[in-house]
Curated annotation (Swiss-Prot):
Primary location class: cytoplasm
Function: Required for maturation of 30S ribosomal subunits.
Record-level GO BP terms: ribosomal small subunit assembly; translation
Protein name: Ribosome maturation factor RimP
UniProt keywords, alphabetically: Cytoplasm, Ribosome biogenesis
Keyword Repeat included in the entry's annotation: no
GO CC field: cytosol
Gene that specifies this protein: rimP
Length: 157
């Protein structure tokens, strides 16, 4: 996790009002600018007008972080829902995604594969068990959380 993400996450988390929760903070290049994406959610999903209200709350808060972690040339702010295909970055994200269809990309191969798509059967805090389709058979693949480079929920068609 980079410094801006950690600083922003630690700073704004206590300011997010109930029933909302801070899902993730992302700091990425977007065209020629830097984009700070603050992903918020709530039980049952979040509405667009709620993200607008949260943006009005969060934007001035970010200006009070000291020392200022942002580049002098500024950045773009986005407050949004994690969406249907939401990123899975923390242990609690994986725990909440048990039973869902996911995509996982690994740092190193397991069973000669670096990417898996399937149902997340279980997660014990350290290991994911993913039910993947191997040709015509289903099989469970155990993936250590430490081996996961990227993961997200997927919409299954």
């Amino acid at each position: 996790m980079n410094d801006v993400v950690k600083i922003v996450e630690d700073f704004i988390k206590p300011h997010i009002p109930k029933p909302f929760e801070l899902f993730a903070v992302e700091w990425e290049k977007f065209g020629g600018d830097m984009m700070l994406s603050i992903l918020v959610d709530k039980e049952g999903g979040i509405e667009i007008d709620e993200t607008a209200e949260l943006s009005e709350l969060i934007s001035p808060l970010l200006d009070t972080i000291s020392p200022d972690p942002f580049p002098t040339e500024g950045y773009l702010l986005e407050v949004a829902s994690p969406g249907a295909e939401r990123p899975l970055r923390k242990a609690e994200h994986f725990a909440g995604a048990v039973g869902e269809y996911i995509f996982v990309k690994l740092y190193q191969k397991i069973n000669n594969e670096k990417e898996f798509t399937g149902d997340l059967v279980s997660f014990d805090g350290e290991t994911l068990v993913v039910d993947v389709l191997d040709k015509t058979r289903h099989k469970n693949i155990e993936i250590p959380l430490s081996a996961v480079a990227k993961a997200q929920t997927m919409v299954k068609f």
